[in-house]
């Protein structure tokens, strides 16, 4: 049982870490592409900014879902009998 709990804790930490890493990379790419687009066509800045914040909000949901799944596996572990 202790081995199972330890492995679940490690798996949850990896799940949360990779979710946060992917989101950080996504935010970096999103911000860079936004700046490139605004530099090319400044008149579209308000429309692009609205879309950027919408996508950023959706992108931010990924680590929150990962944290929820990780906490579920830690506290309500279905693998322990």
Curated annotation (Swiss-Prot):
PROSITE patterns tied to this protein: ATPASE_C
Annotated site (Reversibly protonated during proton transport): 60
Gene Ontology CC terms, in alphabetical order: plasma membrane; proton-transporting ATP synthase complex; proton-transporting two-sector ATPase complex, proton-transporting domain
InterPro entries recorded: ATP_synth_csu_bac/chlpt, ATP_synth_F0_csu, ATP_synth_F0_csu_DDCD_BS, ATP_synth_F0_csu_sf, ATPase_proteolipid_c-like_dom, F/V-ATP_Csub_sf
Transmembrane region(s): 7-27, 55-75
Record keywords: ATP synthesis, Cell inner membrane, Cell membrane, CF(0), Hydrogen ion transport, Ion transport, Lipid-binding, Membrane, Transmembrane, Transmembrane helix, Transport
Gene3D superfamilies documented for this protein: F1F0 ATP synthase subunit C
Membrane topology: Multi-pass membrane protein
A GO molecular-function descriptor: proton-transporting ATP synthase activity, rotational mechanism
Principal localisation: membrane
Cellular compartments annotated: Cell inner membrane
Function: F(1)F(0) ATP synthase produces ATP from ADP in the presence of a proton or sodium gradient. F-type ATPases consist of two structural domains, F(1) containing the extramembraneous catalytic core and F(0) containing the membrane proton channel, linked together by a central stalk and a peripheral stalk. During catalysis, ATP synthesis in the catalytic domain of F(1) is coupled via a rotary mechanism of the central stalk subunits to proton translocation.
Quaternary state and interactors: F-type ATPases have 2 components, F(1) - the catalytic core - and F(0) - the membrane proton channel. F(1) has five subunits: alpha(3), beta(3), gamma(1), delta(1), epsilon(1). F(0) has three main subunits: a(1), b(2) and c(10-14). The alpha and beta chains form an alternating ring which encloses part of the gamma chain. F(1) is attached to F(0) by a central stalk formed by the gamma and epsilon chains, while a peripheral stalk is formed by the delta and b chains.
Similarity comment: family membership: Belongs to the ATPase C chain family.
Full protein name: ATP synthase subunit c
Species annotation: Acinetobacter baumannii (strain ATCC 17978 / DSM 105126 / CIP 53.77 / LMG 1025 / NCDC KC755 / 5377)
Lineage: Bacteria, Pseudomonadati, Pseudomonadota, Gammaproteobacteria, Moraxellales
Gene: atpE
